[in-house]
Amino acid sequence: MPRKTLTELAQNPDLIPGIYNYCDRWCERCPLTSGCLVYTTESDPTDNNDTLNHDVRNAVFWQTLSETLAEVRQLIPEWAKDALNLNHPPKQKTITRQRNVDNHPLTKAGKQYANNASDWFRKLDLDSDPPSTSAKCGSEVARQNPQPFDDAREVIQWYQYQIAVKTMRALSGRKEEIEDPETADFPKDSDGSAKVALIGIDRSIAAWRLMQLSLPDCAESIVPLILQLETLRISLEQSFPEARAFIRPGFDSIPPA
């Protein structure tokens, strides 16, 4: 069967307009690929049933990770007690025209986390044999059941750099919104980008918790990374207070009036 043109594909009523504007570009883990024009143009047109099964599997995966996030939220206050005051992180100033997005504290915090995560995995891999499935600290747990370890690593490394990138997009977008007051009555692109960054932070925190459970002897060394993400989350929410309420096409339901 000949491949459909982009115009023909776009006429599919099951597609969700604009769903790809505020996603994390992780098609392999997306639960809504059946409604995405971008995914449809890149996938095999004969695999419709497989696409639906793919979406169901991914929905279950993210629901499980969401439950892990709820668990780790209960642990963070105890971990943070002697490390830092998460209730009162430094407040972020509103970005101005002169402020360089690259040098914004939120950007720096996102990049610093990415570097620290790289350092952690580098040390882990030096102590591991093989590095993809087990590690010196708690290697027996990971060796007996490698899937949680592999899933956690995959999630962490997917969002590792994206958090800073999406944060920078949010900061840059807000700068443009300040300069163009005509956009004031519309949903803010900066809030949408900030929400994607926040979701990346949430999922990374949950994945680090899975890593703790897979590598119990490494659990303590993971705590600073979780606290770093939690501090960034709070600061980002302070800087973009409407971000969590932003409605992403397809991913978020519109609350009843």
Predicted regions and their residues:
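N-terminal cysteine/histidine-rich coordination modules
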Residues: 1-74
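Metal-dependent nuclease catalytic cores that hydrolyze phosphodiester bonds in DNA/RNA
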Residues: 42-46, 52-110, 116, 120
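Hydrophobic, aromatic-lined core segments that form the binding pocket/scaffold
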Residues: 85-257
